[in-house]
């Protein structure tokens, strides 16, 4: 699945 949510989660994870 391709979504910007991954980018957001990545930011939270650091």
Swiss-Prot record:
The modification Glycine amide is found at residue 14. Keywords: Amidation, Amphibian defense peptide, Antibiotic, Antimicrobial, Secreted. GO terms for biological process: defense response to bacterium. The keyword Hydrolase does not apply. Expressed by the skin glands. It is found in: Secreted. It comes from the Eukaryota. GO terms for cellular component: extracellular region. Antimicrobial peptide. Active against the Gram-positive bacterium S.aureus (MIC>60 uM) and the Gram-negative bacterium E.coli (MIC>60 uM). Belongs to the frog skin active peptide (FSAP) family. Temporin subfamily. This is Temporin-1DYa. It comes from Rana dybowskii (Dybovsky's frog).
């Amino acid at each position: 699945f391709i979504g910007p949510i991954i980018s957001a989660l990545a930011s939270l994870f650091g």
